[in-house]
Amino acid sequence: MIKKYALCLLIATAIAGCKKEVTIKTQPKPPVVAPDSVSFTSVKLEAKKNPGIITKDLVCDITDDQITAVIPQMEKLSKKLVVTFTTQNSTVTKNDTLQVSGKTAVDLRKPVTYTLTSAKGTTRNYRFTVKVFTGIPVLYLTTNGPVVSKDDYVTGKVDVDPNNSFEQEKLSIPLKIKGRGNSTWSEFPKKPYRLKFNDKAAMLGMPAAKNWVLLANYDDKTLMRTRIAFEFARRIGSDFAPQSRFVEVVMNGKFLGNYLLTSQVEVHENRVNITEMTENDNSGDALTGGYLLELDQRKDEKFWFVTKKNLPFTLKSPEETTPAQLKYIKKYIQDTEDALFADNANDPVNGYAKYIDVNSFMNWFFVEEVVKNQDARDFSSIFYYKERKGKLHMGPVWDFDLSSGNVDYSPAKDPKSWYIRDATWMVRLFKDVAFRSKVKKRWNEIRSTAVEAIFKDIDDNAAYLKLSQQQNFSKWPILDKYVWPNAVVLGNYDLEVAYAKDFLMQRIAWIDAEIATY
């Protein structure tokens, strides 16, 4: 047996020895060449390099090709700043002048461009922007007396610091100012204001006009409910939806807090752009428009009337309405209401569609219903307009401080029920199968785009207002206090924002389910 195994081993060895030795050659890997990239790795403003301007080191934000710093002083920059930085593989120049970290002083009152260049010639540009205080624009109001009335204007001026955020041609604007609002003026210490410029002026990228509004948002602790609704309205094409900008307001040297600067609701080429009537427009086509009306239970305008369904309409424009004009628009509104409640209301030719622009009514409805706006169910700030030879439209939307769950005394506090749909005219429209079908189609068109964008808007605005809300609630320490008619008191700004966002998430999901049944 041993001989047998030995023989097998001998044979195997012989066979192995007969094989040709094979050498496998591998190709050498090419050397890894590092990309010739250049970048800032850090940028900061050191207190010791900038005495009298900043009191502690500020680390600048670097996002893509943008560098941003916010200096917590309210005054505009008046001195150059020394910038301290580190880079990857590069030298830094500004307008072909070498910049030395921690030594070169730079005028940063306006954004500057830094150019980084590598040894091999690769370049990259960064835009460096320095803002002051909270980073948002500041309005410095100077008045020739205290502003204590909604009726009497006080003369003065506004100096505008766009804070390197918007283009602003006129930086100092003569004006008149007075109070505005109803409960927001009478009940709250942070007051809203109406501004009337001596001459038309553009504001922070918004088209030129004379009349502007500063909304205080005192009872809206997110500070953004109105802004969110305005932007939603603009995205879905709601008629003449207002533009707006967050601003800090300083009046006569006193900081008043965060405000929303927006347009006055008025007939104007950059606002409600319809024909402006005169006292001579009393017959023919000229008598048919344009009219701007508000459904307002307060009935505190010079010209107003009440329909058979007890809806009070006030006439906003023309301001000096002639008897013929008042008679015409009163009849048109009543004819509209009669058509809505007639037996043939759903007739596409002779029913309500003869009098109203259905798409305009739908877009207005979606804005108000999604955020469940307390006052928009037959109470106030419900605007209509009628252009010359045109139908009745709804808009612009307005007044959203009591929306998105910010009310404790009505069904508007519940995210899971209809509210605007039950208004006098709307409830009748929704009885029409054809109208409900259009509502469903329109909802499906905007649901994944404009509606979904609301949540990103909330997040973006919360980030944008991070420093502003801190200053606002330092001035007005109410986060842990009940302010009429808050549904919740959460004691924290982030929780207030989360509450509003959650309300809208629940609400939109509920609307999804309801409209799916149409």
Predicted regions and their residues:
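Internal "kinase-insert"/substrate-recognition segments embedded within catalytic cores
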Residues: 196-202, 216-217, 238-242, 254-366
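Middle-to-C-terminal accessory/interaction subdomains
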Residues: 173, 184, 188, 316-378, ...
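N-terminal module-boundary/linker segments of secreted carbohydrate-active enzymes
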Residues: 130-168
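Conserved oxyanion/phosphate-binding beta-strand-loop segments in alpha/beta enzyme cores
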Residues: 156-216
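Positively charged n-region of N-terminal signal peptides that target proteins for export
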Residues: 1-5, 19-20
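Short, well-structured beta-strand/strand-turn elements
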Residues: 90-94, 236-248
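C-terminal motif of bacterial Sec signal peptides marking the signal peptidase cleavage site
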Residues: 14-17
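Beta-rich interaction/scaffold domains
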Residues: 19-136, 141
